[in-house]
Amino acid sequence: MRRISLYTLAAAAVMTFGACTTFDCPLYNKVYAKVKLAGDVKTLADTLSVSIPRNMDDDGSDTVVINRLTATDSLSLPMSYQRDEDIYLFCISQYKTGVKTTDTVWVEKQNLPHFESVDCNPAMFHTIKGVRTTHHAIDSIKINNDKVTYNDTKPHFLLYLKERNY
């Protein structure tokens, strides 16, 4: 009798622990687009600030996502969950003259809801459909990887800046 109760207790313990999930949710499920400098300018000597307009109808209201970045070769930009097109304002201040140049970058994308587990927060992945820019300080921007998730290592965009003649 004692042997049966030990077996029953052991079986109950195995079933109880077997029912628990061991799924680890990602800690950082915010999705960022990675931008890498390419072309003649491989490291940013000037100062870069990037902002996102809060409201498309109001030019004076924006959110700064990168403030005075310098001496870098790459950056990460957050992507919106609901908009089909994200707009970024790149303000580049020349380090020798202080002259500021602002370019606008439009990223057209498809939003894809991503579900891992009921225990995890929802995430939104994206497929980049197109990118365009003004050409004041930015020469061009190219799509390098069109799938944006939260564990990408390959840059999504290659950013070509115009060569400065100081």
Which stretches of residues belong to each language-model region?
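Bacterial Sec-dependent N-terminal signal peptides
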Residues: M1-Y32
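Short, intrinsically disordered low-complexity segments
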Residues: M1-R2, P53, E108
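Start-of-domain marker
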Residues: T21-Q82
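Extracytoplasmic cysteine-anchoring/structural motifs
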Residues: C20-L27, S74, P78-Y166
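Hydrophobic transmembrane signal anchors and adjacent membrane-proximal interface regions, especially
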Residues: I4, T43-V50, V64-I66, H126, ...
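A broad, structure-centric signal for solvent-exposed, well-ordered loop/edge residues
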Residues: T8, D57-D59, D84, H114
